[in-house]
Amino acid sequence: MIVRIWHGWTTRANADAYEHLLHEEIFVGIRNREIEGFRGIQLLRRRLADGVEFVTIMTFDSLEAVRDFAGADYEQAVVPPKARALLARFDERSAHYEVVI
């Protein structure tokens, strides 16, 4: 199993709108793609002194399933324009880990 982890940061003013966009539109769109080997997605949120950090954790059966989601350069972050508009900054690349236990 492969876990894909990505970080994005918003201002406090944009945090609720960003979370809503993810929950109501972006995550729904990912699920609707019915990618074989996609197992799920989680969203973490943490308030910081200068904004809000979000972490997405996606689970896949294999790197091939990750490629089906993200493309050949599977480490490249997938950040739709609506999300970019609400983010102050974000990781340009996602990290991938093999689950061993």
Task: Report the location of each language-model feature.
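Weak global preference for isoleucine
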Residues: 2-5, 26, 30, 35, ...
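Short, well-ordered beta-strand segments in beta-rich or mixed alpha/beta enzyme
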Residues: 2-9, 40-74
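Histidine (H) residue identity feature
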Residues: 7, 20-23, 96
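Short polar catalytic/cofactor-binding loops
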Residues: 10-13, 100
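Short amphipathic alpha-helical segments
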Residues: 14-40, 74-82
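Glycine-rich beta-strand-turn "strand-cap" elements at beta-sheet edges
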Residues: 39-52, 78-101
